[in-house]
Amino acid sequence: MTSEQTLLVLGIETTCDETAAAVVERRADGSGRILSNIVRSQTDEHAPFGGVVPEIAARAHVDLLDGIVARAMREAGTGFPELSGVAAAAGPGLIGGVIVGLTTAKAIALVHNTPLIAVNHLEAHALTPRLTDATEFPYCLFLASGGHTQIVAVRGVGDYVRLGTTVDDAIGEAFDKIAKMLGLPYPGGPQVERAAASGDAVRFAFPRPMLGRPDANFSLSGLKTAVRNEASRLTPLEPQDINDLCAGFQAAVLDSMADRLTSGLRLFRERFGAPKALVAAGGVAANQAIRRALREVAAKAQTTLIVPPPALCTDNGAMIAWAGAERLALGLTDSMDAAPRARWLLDANATAPGKFANTRAGF
């Protein structure tokens, strides 16, 4: 396969609690088109437990995936023999679910003698704006989800440099934990956003973690503790208390995020020149308050903000299919020995950040 061909790729996503499959077309000029994109959320299965249960997720993927793939192929109006490749998220994620998706992709590829592409789930998020907006390299990616918070220089397919990451909780994880702490239903992120809209963001003086540091790392554990302490002090909580706590928490996250992104964009410019865009991806990018804050950051940095539609920010099969197509266009395929991975760094050279290392000159 070469970049001069039109490619048709099936993508499978099973890394967490969405069972998804999609068919995407990548044209010779590098543009793309989604032919189908089927996502089945497992929210109902996990809601009684207040979070994702890995074994339940894996079993649900087993039960659902064949039907989801069949529907994706049917809606795309194509058959397996017409596919140029089969892509599956091979990690990072909950290993049981990753095994289900990757094994299914291998079976399809083997039976139909079709190339297999084992996709890094994070790379799929990183490349989505090239599908939705034909974004050119290099660009600065803000990836924020329940499991990841990273600022990444995206220089090309397979070429990523992590500029910043969280030293403790991911942003989406923190939203979910605050929701659970305050007794809000699962999934917690949208519930916190909804409550915050009716709250007083200045009632509580919550900390803004990492503000003013020259690096681009995040930390949310101290903020989470501050919210817990206020909630404990006010117990029993009135509905307005919950709204105000959510509003104060979200405002602190927005201030911290804006500061960290400003540092990340500065680091990007110092190392790689001006980015073609600031791109936001991951489920957290569906939060409208976060989108507004991102627009302000991009405007101050005099760069373009690109945020894919909400359905393509959260986990989906189209992003896996597109990443597979991008890799396939470069001749990058995988053997049947491709292993599922619970952990898989986007930047293979990245190291764990030190929470208080190299924070200020002379510190």
Swiss-Prot record:
Record has Ion transport as a keyword: no
Binding-site residues for Fe cation, renumbered to this chain: H121, H125, D315
Cofactor(s) required for function per UniProt: Fe(2+)
UniProt subcellular location: Cytoplasm
The enzyme's E.C. designation: 2.3.1.234
Binding residues for substrate: L143, A144, S145, G146, G147, D176, G189, N287
Domain of life, source organism: Bacteria
Gene3D superfamilies in alphabetical order: 3.30.420.40
Catalytic activity as recorded in UniProt: L-threonylcarbamoyladenylate + adenosine(37) in tRNA = N(6)-L-threonylcarbamoyladenosine(37) in tRNA + AMP + H(+)
Keyword set includes Transmembrane helix: no
Co-factor binding comment: Binds 1 Fe(2+) ion per subunit.
Major site of localization recorded for this protein: cytoplasm
One example GO MF annotation: N(6)-L-threonylcarbamoyladenine synthase activity
Keywords in alphabetical order: Acyltransferase, Cytoplasm, Iron, Metal-binding, Transferase, tRNA processing
Pfam families registered for this protein in UniProt: TsaD
BP GO annotations: tRNA threonylcarbamoyladenosine modification
GO annotation, cellular component aspect: cytoplasm
Physiological role: Required for the formation of a threonylcarbamoyl group on adenosine at position 37 (t(6)A37) in tRNAs that read codons beginning with adenine. Is involved in the transfer of the threonylcarbamoyl moiety of threonylcarbamoyl-AMP (TC-AMP) to the N6 group of A37, together with TsaE and TsaB. TsaD likely plays a direct catalytic role in this reaction.
HAMAP family the UniProt entry points to: TsaD
Family note: Belongs to the KAE1 / TsaD family.
PANTHER family listed in its UniProt record: TRNA N6-ADENOSINE THREONYLCARBAMOYLTRANSFERASE, TRNA N6-ADENOSINE THREONYLCARBAMOYLTRANSFERASE, MITOCHONDRIAL
Protein name: tRNA N6-adenosine threonylcarbamoyltransferase
Organism: Rhodopseudomonas palustris (strain HaA2)
Organism lineage: Bacteria, Pseudomonadati, Pseudomonadota, Alphaproteobacteria, Hyphomicrobiales
